[in-house]
């Protein structure tokens, strides 16, 4: 089981779709060697060094957290049903209301659209909020994603810079 890494007062909570088998096996988020999450958040400015999956708890030192829409691990995220994503979206809203981070970053358009019953999402900041928490949709850093490392870093950096501008 991959546990959430959450605390009150975070700058951002990154929300993956669901754990892959590598993460489920190790208990650490974004654990597959091909997953670019740790490299991306470092290069985008969220951390001052590239953390390893087993150092995930140190995200809290940077006022960052991690959660997921669906707890069930799969080989590929497309094995998760629309119903699971929708139910996960409802649970996620409750978590965000409890912890009130400044931003929630959903990692993937389809995850956001199905989890929050939205259509036509664009990358970046959304108009929908959860209380005062901004919602951002960022490309998924999975090794299966065709988005280049450069584009991932650019998208994540935009969120980091928006938080910096707000003094966070």
Swiss-Prot record:
InterPro entries: MUG/TDG, MUG_bact, Uracil-DNA_glycosylase-like, Uracil-DNA_glycosylase-like_sf. One of its GO terms (biological process) is base-excision repair, AP site formation. SUPFAM superfamilies: Uracil-DNA glycosylase-like. It is found in: Cytoplasm. Keywords: Cytoplasm, DNA damage, DNA excision, DNA repair, DNA-binding, Hydrolase. The keyword rRNA processing does not apply. Its EC number is 3.2.2.28. GO terms for cellular component: cytoplasm. GO terms for molecular function: DNA binding; pyrimidine-specific mismatch base pair DNA N-glycosylase activity; uracil DNA N-glycosylase activity. The keyword Ligase does not apply. Its main location: cytoplasm. Binds DNA as a monomer. HAMAP family: MUG. This is G/U mismatch-specific DNA glycosylase. The lineage of its organism: Bacteria, Pseudomonadati, Pseudomonadota, Gammaproteobacteria, Enterobacterales.
């Amino acid at each position: 089981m991959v546990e959430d890494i959450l605390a009150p007062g975070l700058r951002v909570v990154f929300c993956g779709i669901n754990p892959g088998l590598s993460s489920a096996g190790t208990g650490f988020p974004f654990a597959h060697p091909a997953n670019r999450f740790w490299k991306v958040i470092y290069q985008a400015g969220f951390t001052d060094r590239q953390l390893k999956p087993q150092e995930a708890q140190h995200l809290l030192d940077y006022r960052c957290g991690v959660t997921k829409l669906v707890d069930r691990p799969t080989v590929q995220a497309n094995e998760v049903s629309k119903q699971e994503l929708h139910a996960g979206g409802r649970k996620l809203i409750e978590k965000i209301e409890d912890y009130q981070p400044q931003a929630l970053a959903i990692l993937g358009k389809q995850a956001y659209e199905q989890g929050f019953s939205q259509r036509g999402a664009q990358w970046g900041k959304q108009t929908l909020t959860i209380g005062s928490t901004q919602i951002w949709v960022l490309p998924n850093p999975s090794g299966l994603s065709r988005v280049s490392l450069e584009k991932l870093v650019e998208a994540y950096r935009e969120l980091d810079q928006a938080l910096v501008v707000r003094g966070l």
